[in-house]
Amino acid sequence: MVLEYMDNTKNDHYFLDKIKTDIAFIVDHMKGVDAQELNDNEILLDSMLFRMIQISENAKKLSADCMEKTSELPWNELIGFRNRIVHDYGNVDLSIVFETLKYDIPVLLSQLVDIDSGME
């Protein structure tokens, strides 16, 4: 039925699931990785940055209602991070990237799991 696809709740769950999948990928692949390894491993770095871009792109597709209900999450920072990666790739501070991937992203995953279970 056409109306099912217009249901923002389903769309929000879909995009939140995609965001959680990308975050879980980052958490899994950053285990045991230090800043030097991330800096030296171009494939790993590109993969992590691609996932961050995807997280941001999907965050931008969340409804205003969902963003408001989850306003404690750093949506604007995620979107800004994406813009920095995409538009100023050569000047991205890898120490900030590492800190974000290693320490901030796992916390975000935990928050999303808690929020998503509360939305059901």
Task: Kindly give the residue locations of the regions a language model identified.
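Solvent-exposed interaction patches of small proteins and small membrane subunits
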Residues: 1-120
